[in-house]
Structure formats: C-alpha cells, structure tokens
Amino acid sequence: MKFSKFYAISTKENPKDATLPSHIFLVKGAFIEQIGSGLYNFLPLGKRVLDKIKNIIKEEMDKAGALEVNLSFNTPAELWKESGRFNVFGKELLRFKDRKENDFVLGPTHEEAMVALIRNKITSYKQLPLHLYQIGLKFRDEARPRFGLLRCREFLMKDGYSFHASEADLDKEFNLMHETYSKILTRLGLDFRAVEADSGAIGGSGSKEFMVLAKNGEDDILLCEHCDYAANIEAAKRTKKTCTDERPEADFATQFHTPNVKTIEELAEFFKINPYYTIKAIAKKAIYESEEKIIVFFIRGDDELQEVKALNAANALELVDVSEEELEKAGLVPGFIGFVGLNGVDFYIDHELENETNMIIGANKKDYHLVGINVVNLNKERFKDLAAVKEHDLCPKCQHKLKQSKGIEVGHIFKLGKKYSQAMNASYLDENGKAQFFTMGCYGMGVSRLVAVAIEASHDEKGCIWNKTLAPFVLDIIVSNIKDIKAMEFAEQIYTHFKDKEILFDDRNERFGVKINDFELMGFPYALVIGKSLENDEVELIHRNTLEKQVLKTQEVISHLEKIL
C-alpha cells in the first residue's frame, strides 16, 4: 500500500481527557476517532488490526468446534424479562421502544437471545453438546465512558454459549475454552494470566478471567510465582492466616469497659494485643429489588472487607454505606457491634474466623467489648469468604507469598449452569425421555478492547509498538527525499518485490521528520529508510521496539527482509 493512497492522517494534539497511552496513541496515530461519549470509529489502520484479531479468534474458535452465528444487535425485551434481568441489570442496559411501543434492549450480552435461538429446536440429548458464538457489536450505557477503547459504550465482542446435557460435559468445554483462549492470546503475542474471578451480573459459577499484564491495568490481580495460581482480587483466596503473638485470655464472653474505644487500632492498644485477635464489624445497607436492609459483616481486625465478596454473600444488587443514625435506628451501637446476642439484623462472618477462640468483639453496648469469645456453634450459613486477600498473603495452593500485579481483562469464561435455561424454560429430552434444562457455559472476549490492550502492554513515549502479528503494516518504506529519483526507484523495487506482504510505502511529499514521527507513532515493526547513504549502496533498517538502527548494503536488503518479514 502506498501512503499517498492511504487514509491515515495523524495529529499532534492529545485527545481531550485522554490519560492512557493506548487512548492517546490510537487517536493521534489515526487508528480510531471519537464521535461521541464512549463511541469510536475504526479508521483503516485500526480496522486492519481489528480484522487480524478477529481472524485469529475465529480460527481458534472454529478449530475448537464452535459454530459461528450472527444475532441481532437488538433484543426483544420479553426475553430479558423471562430471564429476570430486565429490571435488575441497571442503567447500563439501554432500553427503548419502537414506533409500535414494543420494548427492546441493545444487547450488552446475548444469553437470552442464544437460549431463545435453540429453545424448541434442540430437543434431544443426541443433539448435544452445541457451542454457538458470534463476533458482533455490544452496547453498555456506561455512566462514565473513559480510557478510550477500554471502557466505551459500543464495542466489538466475541461471545460464545455452549449447551450440554451434564455438568461433566460442560467441564470439558470449559477446559477446552480455557485452552482455546490461551492459544488466541499467545498467538496475539500478549503476556497474560488466567485468573480465578467473580461471575458478576451474568451469574453462574466456575469463572475465570483472562488478564493481560499491564502497568496501567484497571484490575488488581494476585499471582503466585511458584505455582499457577492467579486470581482477581475480588475472588482471591489464601491459606488461612496465623499469628504467634499471645492470645488474650479471659472467661468466655467477659464484658470489659472500653470507653471511647471504637476502632481496631484503639482496641488493640487498649488490650495490648495483636489486632489479629480482634473481630471487626462493618455494616452496610444491602439494596434488593424490592427492599433495603442493614447487614453486618464480621472479619478479623487486621483484615479489610472485600466488597464483591460481601455483595455475593448478601446476594444483593448493591451495598452502600450506612450512617450512624441509621445504625442506631436499627438498634445497633456504632463502634461496638458484635454478633453475640445480635438480633433482628442479618450478619455474616468471615470463614477464617470459624472455630477461633479467645477473640475480642463489640458487646452491642456503648463503651463495652467482650473478651474470650469463641466463634463456635453458629449456623454454617453465617460463614462466608469476606476478607480481601493482600500481597504477601500465602498462596492457597503452595503456601508461597502472593504478588500483586495490574492487569486488563480481555476474556471471561463462565459455567452458567441452568440459570438461564431454567428461567426461560429451555429444555431437551434426556436418554430416558425426561425433560431436562440445558446446562450452559458462556465465553466472552473483548475484540475491540484487545486493540487498546496490545498498546497498553507495548508502547514507549513516542507511540505504539506493534508486534508482527498485530501490526497493520510490518514494514514502512521511507524515502527521505521523494525528488531523489534513484532513491524512489530503489524503494519501488523493494515495494514491488514484497507487494504480497504487509508493506507501506511512504511516498508522500512530506518532510522526512514527519514521516519518521508517523512511523514511531503508528508503531510498525520496521522502517526501511532510503536516503543519502544510498550513494554508498547503504540503507537503514529501524527496529521500532528498540529504535535500533541497522545499516544494510543494498544488495542484502531483500534477503534480510525475507528473513524478518
């Protein structure tokens, strides 16, 4: 492709409100342009990258036996009402009416549409398993779109849905998709980890996220460098904490006067003990579809509450902070809340506290704590995983220290189970002729997001650094002076020889500095610079990842390029 015939007009100014390198460089480098809040056009350079990603995803999904479909971007609201998500999904779900007052949604995901597609058509276990996928537009009405392609409102996504007759068969497909996603990201040249994750609004269990490691990542992940354990901080687990400091000794539930001792730090100082032996109470207001109520979460004093874990324990739509006035109205004593004798309020206790002895906790009485509490003989349903796992906590698999890192989610696979098939009455006949609901899996990958992620993972202060797999062009032929006939003839010779490759011939009537700046900004892997040194039968090859300049003799240019392109 000759640059003079190509549409790629770079800009010098950073886009407004852009903070991430991928957002800045993709806009300045003419890969994308913003047309509205969270809405982007893909320009020819960006479209070439996007198509490469799509093709690799399609190749690997097809190899895995999945079948490609293309579902409508619009989904009748009746399907979302069947699943129960229409009223609970939140404002991110864009709802609208057509001219006949029929309700529709712009799909952020397509579980409902896929179930409707196979419902009453797949009727026998003999037709299972079945895996359908699509690569298409999705829409989420984000309250604060930001970070360019990483958090926009309209995006391209690969979403797949599998249907099975048993959990065991779903497990096989889940493992196959784990392997397939790993192959895709490896082919894309990205440094990634598959991490344990929370299922979020989609629901289900058996959830893994695929995270590309990047210092500007929006997600915190915990990794073990001694085994394969990795988890999103929202779902991370650890080996149970221990402490060798002396425990507080007292008869069971001895009441101590602790005037104005409201915080864990004050409590530990008052009793001269390690906060490990105290129990912290965090009260939240849980928001449900038709009610609100206060729930108290109890964790070890030196831990922090993990909000997503708490949300899952409460099975609520949202958890919000609660005022002291609201606590007092509910009969609670701020700063002195404990679960002993706590009535009329739901509460959960971190599972690591089960069977602990000689602990200190609030007495539900102003200025009093209980010492010598044994966390025993409580309903098992009270105990949930609530504490946030931190760096240097011990790996749940091998007991080595965990390391915290930053990552960007690019894929997510779920075991949905029967959540959607049961809600939408989608069933088949098993080998005994009995109706059974489909067991489902769900597999998503952010296609347009991967364009930005690749640059977050690989850039410098000058611009993008594409690997050869993703680069829109692998080589940029730059003639420093297009009026130099010999230089243009040599460039044309190289261009013609490699015309079947992804070559960009910068034949524009622009200053040399403009061409080099565009090469560095757009980030093609190599540039072949043909300038004054051609008089000495020499040209210069620039490696974009290091900006190293390599002098080549003209007679060796073709053979050298054949090796690297």
Curated annotation (Swiss-Prot):
- GO biological process entries: prolyl-tRNA aminoacylation
Query: Where does it sit, as one GO cellular component term?
Result: cytosol
Give the EC number.
Answer: 6.1.1.15
Q: Which PROSITE patterns match?
A: AA_TRNA_LIGASE_II
SUPFAM superfamilies hit by this protein: Class II aaRS ABD-related (SSF52954), Class II aaRS and biotin synthetases (SSF55681), YbaK/ProRS associated domain (SSF55826)
**Where does it live in the cell?**
Cytoplasm
Query: Which UniProt key words apply to this protein?
Result: Aminoacyl-tRNA synthetase, ATP-binding, Cytoplasm, Ligase, Nucleotide-binding, Protein biosynthesis
Q: What is its main location?
A: cytoplasm
Q: Which GO terms describe its molecular function?
A: aminoacyl-tRNA deacylase activity; ATP binding; proline-tRNA ligase activity
Q: Which InterPro entries match?
A: aa-tRNA-synt_IIb, aa-tRNA-synth_II, aa-tRNA-synth_II/BPL/LPL, Anticodon-bd, Anticodon-bd_dom_sf, Pro-tRNA-ligase_IIa, Pro-tRNA-synth_IIa_bac-type, Pro-tRNA-Synthase_IIa_type1
Reactions this protein catalyses: tRNA(Pro) + L-proline + ATP = L-prolyl-tRNA(Pro) + AMP + diphosphate
Looking at the UniProt entry, the stretches that span the membrane are: none
Q: What class of enzyme is it?
A: ligase
Q: Does the keyword Cytoplasm apply?
A: yes
Gene3D superfamilies membership: Anticodon-binding domain, Bira Bifunctional Protein, Domain 2
Q: Which family, according to UniProt?
A: Belongs to the class-II aminoacyl-tRNA synthetase family. ProS type 1 subfamily.
What this protein is reported to do is described as: Catalyzes the attachment of proline to tRNA(Pro) in a two-step reaction: proline is first activated by ATP to form Pro-AMP and then transferred to the acceptor end of tRNA(Pro). As ProRS can inadvertently accommodate and process non-cognate amino acids such as alanine and cysteine, to avoid such errors it has two additional distinct editing activities against alanine. One activity is designated as 'pretransfer' editing and involves the tRNA(Pro)-independent hydrolysis of activated Ala-AMP.
Question: Regarding domains, what does the record say?
Answer: Consists of three domains: the N-terminal catalytic domain, the editing domain and the C-terminal anticodon-binding domain.
PANTHER family according to UniProt:
MITOCHONDRIAL RIBOSOME PROTEIN L39/PROLYL-TRNA LIGASE FAMILY MEMBER, PROLINE--TRNA LIGASE
Assembly and oligomerization: Homodimer.
Q: Which named protein is this?
A: Proline--tRNA ligase
Organism in which the protein naturally occurs: Campylobacter lari (strain RM2100 / D67 / ATCC BAA-1060)
